[in-house]
A protein has these predicted regions:
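Class I SAM-dependent methyltransferase SAM/SAH-binding core
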Residues: 54, 60-108
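Short conserved loop adjoining the S-adenosyl-L-methionine
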Residues: 109-114
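A conserved beta-strand element that flanks and buttresses the S-adenosyl-L-methionine
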Residues: 121
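Short catalytic micro-motifs in class I SAM-dependent methyltransferases
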Residues: 124-128
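A short glycine-rich, Lys/Arg-flanked "PGG" loop and its adjoining helix->strand segment in the class I
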Residues: 136-148
Length: 207
């Protein structure tokens, strides 16, 4: 089964460039990005500072400078969108890009052999995947490709930021008069942990 998220076809060149700029557009977005980087750095340390990391989806490469801080780390910069990868390769610093191996592939069908990376670094993706069967397929694919860890960001219930996100998504749905389509999901923490375990993972920690 080929799985494509509803928004995945929108990233032409202009959308990819907009995605790059939006994380630096305002003070709030810059602070949010700074916080994301701090948390990601801590998560990598918890994962043993892996040497070979698959950044999927890499987007416009906003985490590449942080991933490249470890001198011997190899980064596979992967995204479903070739425009995203091209934007990342053109916009990130040359000394960082030289450390990156680009790979266009889907998170649901990763074009890599079994146990081929030390860690999969997955930021800002799973909250777009509303179908539990699709999440299960993605997590099973992650389990196949990594030989050690997965670092994954998601929105779970039970905290203020998740509550704000739920309120925002409710407003968006009302404004668009949507009849079932959602692009972002806040998930119950217990459900997420169960899905991880069913895919073969054990939760080492959370931030």
């Amino acid at each position: 089964e080929n799985i494509a998220l509803a928004f995945s076809g929108k990233y032409d060149k202009s959308h990819a460039e907009h995605y790059l700029s939006k994380h630096q557009a305002t003070l709030a977005s810059r602070l949010s990005h700074w916080r994301d980087v701090q948390l990601a750095r801590k998560a990598l340390h918890m994962a043993g500072d892996p040497d070979l990391v698959l950044d999927l989806p890499c987007g416009a490469g906003r985490f590449w400078p942080m991933l490249a801080e470890q001198p011997n780390r190899v980064i596979i910069g992967s995204d479903n969108s070739s425009n995203m990868i091209a934007t990342a390769m053109q916009s990130q610093p040359a000394h960082v890009v030289s450390r990156v191996r680009p790979l266009q592939t889907s998170a649901f069908d990763i074009n890599l052999p079994d146990q081929s990376v030390d860690s999969i670094f997955c930021m800002r993706l799973i909250h777009h995947v509303g179908d539990p069967a699709h999440r299960a397929k993605m997590l099973r694919e992650f389990h196949r490709v990594t030989r050690d860890t997965v670092i994954i960001s998601l929105w779970v219930d039970g905290n203020y930021k998740a509550w704000r996100r739920q309120k925002l998504e409710a407003k968006r749905a009302a404004r668009r008069k949507e009849t079932g389509y959602q692009n972002r999901f806040v998930l119950p923490a217990g459900q997420v942990e169960s899905e991880f375990e069913q895919a073969g993972f054990s939760v080492v920690g959370s931030l």
